[in-house]
Regions:
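Short helix-loop-helix connector
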Residues: 88, 183-184
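Membrane-interface alpha-helices at helix entry/exit sites of multi-pass transporters
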Residues: 93-99, 185-198
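Membrane-embedded translocation segments of transport machinery
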Residues: 1-91, 98, 103-157
Length: 255
């Protein structure tokens, strides 16, 4: 637990520093305008976008965004639910919902605005042209190009690369811990079990990337396919989850 905790705290500090540098020394007014307008557009169009179907949206959009990310979230749900439940022990239902359902999405939208908004700003100002990179799905090239255009240049790109690497490490560690807990049947699985599942996930990802010749297309398809049976497993939580949360809230004197 201490390893995950140290990495997570370091990552939070590094993310705050990077975000502060981008906002203060970058196009501050533009980023502020983008965030306010984007949030207004998002809230105003939430239901129409959430219920969009292939009849009103291009097939490629539904495939690469709606379907893929629905499957992505479904695939992550069981492991993240187990992990969040474990680290939330001792906290109230209200505190957990506040952290997971409110604060985390707000932090995510701010981070997307800082990086994505900076990319849009430099694209519009002619600093670079990401059209070819995005059309060919070279997201790594686009990300590094945007990072090098941020305040700090190469140093900022290196910091973002480090941040991303640690995020992947903490996510993998959390997932292996969740799988080990389920497999062991208790909250304190042996370290070798966590190492085994971490290695198994890394090996599977490497195999899928190798099959896709270094591209993430095969990995994305695998996520979508495996999310189908997982969705059946988590389906009962749609009605058992609220009842469990309500029961806990009553026990904690919140309702």
């Amino acid at each position: 637990h201490r390893g995950i905790q140290l990495l997570s705290r370091f990552n939070v500090i590094l993310a705050l520093v990077i975000a502060g540098v981008i906002f203060v020394f970058g196009p501050t007014l533009f980023l502020t305008d983008v965030y306010v307008q984007s949030m207004g557009q998002y809230l105003g169009s939430f239901f129409s976008m959430a219920t969009m179907t292939a009849q009103t949206a291009p097939d490629w959009w539904m495939k690469w965004w709606t379907v893929f990310f629905f499957a992505w979230f479904i695939g992550y749900t069981p492991l993240m639910a187990v992990f969040v439940s474990r680290i939330s022990r001792g906290r109230t239902v209200r505190e957990t919902i506040m952290a997971v359902a409110i604060l985390a999405p707000i932090a995510t939208t701010i981070w997307f605005t800082l990086l994505g908004g900076s990319g849009i700003y430099h694209q519009l100002s002619g600093t670079f042209d990401l059209t070819d990179a995005l059309n060919s799905f070279q997201f790594d090239v686009a990300t590094l190009t945007v990072a090098q255009a941020l305040p700090g240049g190469t140093w900022m790109a290196a910091a973002i690369l480090l941040l991303t690497t640690i995020f992947v490490a903490t996510t993998g560690d959390s997932m292996s811990y969740s799988i080990a807990m389920v497999g062991a049947g208790h909250d304190e699985p042996q370290p070798w079990i966590r190492v085994f599942w971490g290695g198994a996930m890394a090996l599977m990802a490497a195999i899928l990337l190798y099959m896709g010749a270094g591209q993430i297309g095969v990995l994305q398809q695998f996520i979508v396919i495996t999310a189908i049976p997982v969705s059946l497993i988590i389906l009962p939580s749609l009605w058992t989850g609220p009842r469990a949360a309500s029961a806990l809230a009553k026990e904690q004197g919140l309702t």
